[in-house]
Amino acid sequence: MARKTVSRKRKAEEPKEQQFDWCQSAFKRPRVSSSVRHAQHWWQSRRSVVCSVRGREFRPQQQHEWSFQRSLRGFAAGRIPGILREREFSLGRLNKVFASQWLNHRQVVCGTKCNTLFVVDVLSGQITRIPMLKDREGRGEVSQGLGGVGSPFHFHNPGSVGGLDVQQGCGIHAIELNPSRTLLATGGDNPNSLAVYRLPTLDPVCVGDDGHNDWIFSIAWISDTMAVSGSRDGSMGLWEISEDVLSQAEKRQNVEGVPGYSHISHRALKDIPKEYTHPYNCKVRALAFNNSHKELGAVSLDGYFHLWKAEDNLSKELSTKLPYCKENVCLAYGLDWSVYAVGSQAHVSFLDPRQSSQNIKSVSSRERGSGIRSVSFYEHIVTVGTGQGSLLFYDIRAQRFLDGPSSTPGGYRNRTAEGILKLTTGRGWLNHDETWRSYFSDIRSFPNAVYTHCYDDSGTKLFVAGGPLCSGLHGNYAGLWS
C-alpha cells in the first residue's frame, strides 16, 4: 500500500500537459516553458538514477512545445506575405542600396553603391552614417599585419589615413553578421578590403587590406571568428578575427579614448577554378555557408556553382555548371531543405550538391530579362526580389508560388495573370541628373530593383531596399513591409 500511495503522490505532482490556444502569437514563448526548463534542470542536477529518470519526463513536453511552435511559424510564414503593407523611408541622395541586415528589432544596417554604410531606425526613419575603415598607409610596403604568430599590429584612427578615392560603380555589396551577432563584416573605404565592426556599438575592429585586387562582392561567416570574402578578381579570402585583434582594438580605445582598428592579413587566398571558361569571367559573385556540413557554396559569373570545404582552410570539393548561367548574382542556403537557391536572369534554381546536376530544379520568375537580384529562405518560403521591383514568394514545400488575393486593397499588392502573389516596391527617389535628362527623361517612372531584402527574427517584418536597375541612373529605395 505504501508503494501505491507514493505512486499516487508522484503522479499528482506531475505537471499537467500545457494547453495551447490558436490565438497565441506564433513567436511568443509559452508561459510555463521557463518553469518546465527550470524543473528539468533541477531534477537533472540531483545526482541519482531516480532524479535522472524524473528529469527525462519533461523532455516529451518540451519537444511537443517546440514542434507546435515550429508548425505555427510555418503556418504564419505562408500567410504573412499576403497581408504585408509597405512604409517607405527617405534616404536622401544616396545611390542604390546593395546590402542590408537587421541589427535588432528596430535597426537595419545598409550599404550603398556610393560606398556609404548607415543604420536606419525603422520606427523613426532616422538615418545614422557609420565611418568607413581605411587601408593602411603605403599599402605597397611589406607588412604582415596580424597574419601570422608574432607579427606586428598596425593601428589607425578613423580618418587618420587618407583613403583611396571612391571607385565609380562599386560600393558596398555585402554585409554579414557572425553567428553570435557580436561582429559585423562588410566592405571598407577601399571596396577591395574587408572591414569588421564590433556589435552592438559598431566600433571598428580591423581591416583586411592585402587580399583582393578587385571589389568584394560577397561575405560569409564560417564561424564566430572566421569570415570568407568573395571578390571580382576571382578569389576567395579567409580572414581570422582573433582574440588578439579584438583585445588590442579595445585596449587602444581605452587608452586613447578614440576607437582604433588594426590591419590584418588573409589566412588563405584561393582562386576559383578557371579551367572551364574564360578566366576573366570567373568573378565570385555570391557566397552561402552550410554550417551543418561546414561547406561553402560560391557562384561565379561564368555560370558555375562551386562547393568548398570551409573550416580552418578552404579546399575545393566540386564545380557544377548551372542550368541558367546568365546574371547569377545571388545565392542562399536553406538549412531545413539542404539546398542552395541560385538567382539568374529569369529563374531560381534549387541545387543539392549531393545529387546529380540533372536533378537541379528551376522555376521561372515570370519577369524575363530583369533578373533575380536577391533571394532568401524563411521557413518553407523562398522570397525572390527582381529587377522590376517585385517580391515573389515560392513555397518550396508545395513547389509553387503563393497565390495572390482575389481583391487587392492598396496600390502595391497585386495578383499576376498567373494568379500568384506579387508585391511591388514604391517609387523611391530618382536623381534627374544629366544622364536622366539625356537618355531617360521621356520615361515616366522606373521600377526599383530589389537588390536586398531581409526578415527580422519574428518573420513578420521584411526590410526591402534597392534602386533603379540601369547602372547609369542614380536613385534609391528602402521600405519596411509589415
UniProtKB/Swiss-Prot annotation:
Name the principal localization, coarsely classed: cytoplasm
Q: Which domain of life is it from?
A: Eukaryota
Q: Which PROSITE patterns match?
A: WD_REPEATS_1, WD_REPEATS_2, WD_REPEATS_REGION
- One GO cellular component term noted in the UniProt record for this chain: centrosome
Q: Which controlled-vocabulary keywords does the entry list?
A: Cytoplasm, Cytoskeleton, Nucleus, Repeat, Ubl conjugation pathway, WD repeat
Which ranges does the UniProt record give for the WD repeats?
A: 167-207, 211-249, 279-318, 367-404
Q: Where in the cell is it found?
A: Cytoplasm; Cytoplasm, Cytoskeleton, Microtubule organizing center, Centrosome; Nucleus
Please give a single GO biological process term from the UniProt record.
Answer: regulation of autophagy
Note the SUPFAM superfamilies from the entry.
WD40 repeat-like
| GO MF annotation terms | ubiquitin-like ligase-substrate adaptor activity
Q: Which InterPro entries match?
A: Beta-prop_DCAF12, DCAF12, WD40/YVTN_repeat-like_dom_sf, WD40_repeat_CS, WD40_repeat_dom_sf, WD40_rpt
Q: In which pathway does it act?
A: Protein modification; protein ubiquitination
Q: What does this protein do?
A: Substrate-recognition component of a DCX (DDB1-CUL4-X-box) E3 ubiquitin-protein ligase complex of the DesCEND (destruction via C-end degrons) pathway, which recognizes a C-degron located at the extreme C terminus of target proteins, leading to their ubiquitination and degradation. The C-degron recognized by the DesCEND pathway is usually a motif of less than ten residues and can be present in full-length proteins, truncated proteins or proteolytically cleaved forms.
Q: Which family does it belong to?
A: Belongs to the WD repeat DCAF12 family.
- Assembly with partners or alone: Component of the DCX(DCAF12) E3 ubiquitin ligase complex, at least composed of cul4 (cul4a or cul4b), ddb1, dcaf12 and rbx1.
The entry's protein name is: DDB1- and CUL4-associated factor 12
